[in-house]
Amino acid sequence: TGRARAGYNRSPVWRGGAILFGPQPRKYDFKVNKKIRKLALRMALSSRLAGDNLLVVKGFDLPEAKTKIFAKIAGNLGLSKALIIAPEETRELVLSSRNLPGITLTTPDQLSVYEILKHKQLVLLEGAVEPVETRLK
């Protein structure tokens, strides 16, 4: 008849047929040097300090794991979208802060530039200042 040979009915030419060059899995991650990562962390912290969005809180002890108590303290400090850096994640801190929208709890070794820039305010608890400083050196 002069028409091109289509082969079988599951050929990529046909509707409902095979996929010829389908999507391939790719890696989109790339390496960032240690010096650049440290510089980015330093710049993120200095931007929060320059904008008066960095608080250092002394004596932030919770008597029990209650969100109500934590919300009251956060309200008194004027925190809305804040990243709280604690020296360690205690049971009371984790349980009382996890249900508050916009408030994230982290430790100095888990601190990331993305988290700092994502949150408007940065709260350093007293014991977390020194580990953050040692990470910047």
Residue ranges with predicted function:
Residues T1-F21:
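Glycine/serine-rich anion-binding loops at beta->alpha junctions
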Residues G22-K137:
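Extended polybasic, low-complexity segments that bind anionic RNA or targeting/receptor surfaces
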